[in-house]
C-alpha cells in the first residue's frame, strides 16, 4: 500500500466518524427575542403593557405621615400631646379594550400604623388603629362597576373640600359593596344608579356598630349631574333599606378663575337619627361650603365650613405646599363648636386642633 492510498483511507475514516458524531449532537434552539416592557399611554401616564398581553397596568400609591396636636375636633376631647400615624397605600389599575367597552379593575391596599397618647399623662406610644386592609377592589366594564368601592352618595357629587378634617360633620358612609351603572353623555350630562350593601361605619359618629343591610333588599342610590367649563351641579338621593328612610344632597361648584373656585352643598334626611346610613349629620339638614385658591404652582389654600341642624359648626383651613414633585406638606388648623343638641355630648363646647401631613405620592 503506498502512502497516497493510506492518506485517502485515513481521510475517509475521519469524515465518516465526524458525520456519525454530528448525527448524535444536540442542536441548541435559536434564542427567543426578548420582549421588553412597553409603555401604554392610552390611559394616561404610568401605564405599561403586561408582557404577552394587551392589558395595561399602573402601579402607584403614597406614603403618608401625620402629626396631630391640640383637641380632637371630632369628639372635643383633649389629646394631651402628639398623636402620630403612618400609612402606605399601594394601588393597582388595569385597563384593556373589549367589544363592550373598556375593561378596568382597581385595587387599593392600605398598611396603617397609628399611635396616640395615654390620655392621662400625655405619654406617646399607645398603639391604635394599626393593621392592613384591602380598602377597595372592583371591576368595571364600560359604565358597569361591581365590587368594594365608596358609596355613590359620596363620590358622585364630589366628596367635600380639599381639607384633611373634611367630615367632622359627616356627609354619609364611605366604603360599601355595590353594583352601579353610570351613564356619561357627550354633552356634560351623566347619571348613576347603584345597589349598595351599606357602609362599614367608617364615616359615622354614633349609632349602630355598622350600616350593612340585614336582608336581601339593598340600599339604592341614584344621581344626576351636569358639568361644563364653568363648573358643575349634581344631586343624589339614597334609600336606606334597613330603617326605610331616605337622604338627599345637592352640590354646586363654580370656577371663578383658573386659580379660584368655590362650592356649596346642602343635604336633607327624612330621619334625624345616627342609624341612618346616608344622613349621618346631626338632625334633618346640613350644609357645607368651601373654596380653593391656587396661589402658585406649588401652593394651594383650602377652606371649608359646615353646620348641621343639631348645632355643630366646623371650620377647617390648610395650605398644601408641594416641596418637590410628588412630595407635599400640608399644615392644617380646625375648629369645632358643639352647640345645640351636641353641647351635652362632649366635655368641651369648643375644640381647636392642628395637623401636619407629609405625603409622598408616586
Curated annotation (Swiss-Prot):
It is found in: Cell outer membrane. GO terms for cellular component: cell outer membrane; pore complex. Consists of 16-stranded beta-barrel sheets, with large surface-exposed loops, that form a transmembrane pore at the center of each barrel. The pore is partially ocluded by a peptide loop that folds into the pore lumen. The lineage of its organism: Bacteria, Pseudomonadati, Pseudomonadota, Alphaproteobacteria, Hyphomicrobiales. Keywords: Cell outer membrane, Ion transport, Membrane, Porin, Signal, Transmembrane, Transmembrane beta strand, Transport. It comes from Brucella suis (strain ATCC 23445 / NCTC 10510). This is Porin Omp2b. One of its GO terms (molecular function) is porin activity. The keyword Lipid biosynthesis does not apply. InterPro entries: Porin_alphabac.
Amino acid at each position: 500500500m503506498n502512502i497516497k492510498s493510506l492518506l485517502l483511507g485515513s481521510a475517509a475514516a475521519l469524515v465518516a466518524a465526524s458525520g456519525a458524531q454530528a448525527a448524535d449532537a444536540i442542536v441548541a434552539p435559536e434564542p427567543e427575542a426578548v420582549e421588553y416592557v412597553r409603555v401604554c399611554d392610552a390611559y394616561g401616564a404610568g401605564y405599561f403593557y403586561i408582557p404577552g398581553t394587551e392589558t395595561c397596568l399602573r402601579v402607584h400609591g403614597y406614603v403618608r405621615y401625620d402629626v396631630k396636636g391640640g383637641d380632637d375636633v371630632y369628639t372635643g376631647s383633649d389629646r394631651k400631646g402628639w398623636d402620630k400615624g403612618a400609612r402606605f397605600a399601594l394601588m393597582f389599575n388595569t385597563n384593556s379594550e373589549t367589544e363592550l367597552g373598556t375593561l378596568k379593575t382597581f385595587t387599593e391596599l392600605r398598611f396603617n400604623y397609628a399611635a396616640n397618647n395615654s390620655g392621662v399623662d400625655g405619654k406617646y406610644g399607645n398603639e391604635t388603629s394599626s393593621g392592613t386592609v384591602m380598602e377597595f377592589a372592583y371591576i368595571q366594564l364600560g359604565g358597569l362597576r361591581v365590587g368594594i368601592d365608596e358609596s355613590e352618595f359620596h363620590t358622585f357629587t364630589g366628596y367635600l373640600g380639599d381639607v384633611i378634617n373634611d367630615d367632622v360633620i359627616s356627609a354619609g358612609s364611605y366604603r360599601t359593596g355595590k353594583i352601579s351603572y353610570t351613564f356619561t353623555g357627550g354633552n356634560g350630562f351623566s347619571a348613576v344608579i347603584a345597589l349598595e350593601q351599606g357602609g362599614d361605619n367608617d364615616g359615622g359618629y354614633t349609632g349602630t356598630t355598622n350600616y350593612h343591610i340585614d336582608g336581601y333588599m339593598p340600599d339604592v342610590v341614584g344621581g344626576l349631574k351636569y358639568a361644563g367649563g364653568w363648573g358643575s351641579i349634581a344631586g343624589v338621593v339614597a334609600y336606606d333599606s334597613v330603617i326605610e328612610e331616605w337622604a338627599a344632597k345637592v352640590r354646586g361648584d363654580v370656577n371663578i378663575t383658573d386659580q379660584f373656585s368655590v362650592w356649596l352643598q346642602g343635604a336633607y334626611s327624612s330621619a334625624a337619627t345616627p342609624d341612618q346610613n346616608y344622613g349621618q349629620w346631626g338632625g334633618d339638614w346640613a350644609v357645607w361650603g368651601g373654596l380653593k385658591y391656587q396661589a402658585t404652582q406649588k401652593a394651594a389654600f383650602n377652606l371649608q365650613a359646615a353646620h348641621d341642624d343639631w348645632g355643630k359648626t366646623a371650620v377647617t383651613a390648610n395650605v398644601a405646599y408641594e416641596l418637590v414633585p410628588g412630595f407635599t406638606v400640608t399644615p392644617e388648623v380646625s375648629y369645632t363648636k358643639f352647640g345645640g343638641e351636641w353641647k351635652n355630648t362632649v366635655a368641651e363646647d369648643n375644640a381647636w386642633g392642628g395637623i401636619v401631613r407629609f405625603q409622598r405620592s408616586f
